[in-house]
Amino acid sequence: ENELGTSVSTADDLLKIGHFIDEKSIKNLKIWFDIANYYIVEPQVDKVIPKLKKYIYYIHCKNYVSNDLGIHYVELGKGIIDYKTIIHEIHEHFIDLIFSLEVHEKEIDKKAEVVRKSYLTLNEYINGG
């Protein structure tokens, strides 16, 4: 997974891993691509997706807003990342991927609703809505 604060966060880092996979002929190793983590480093996610087509198998989806206090995670359809456009771009380059949701809602009484809304949003975007 491309994780902030590690040596794997930029497109170049991910491509190095991809080239390593190629050099070693590793058939069952793929990249777990976290869109939000990448977006924080480089907002033009759509430009890296075609380059990593061969290596990504798993897409991790979460969204956030940013202000003077830092990053605050929100439901998928309410944040800074335009998942509808990004998922459309993903569909242009991939046939078979696994998508997952990550929800950081801290208030227990809101968590189920945030997960439900995020799931419905992701499902809509995946299915062309």
Residue ranges and their predicted role:
Residues 8-33, 39-129:
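Histidine-acidic metal/acid-base catalytic patches
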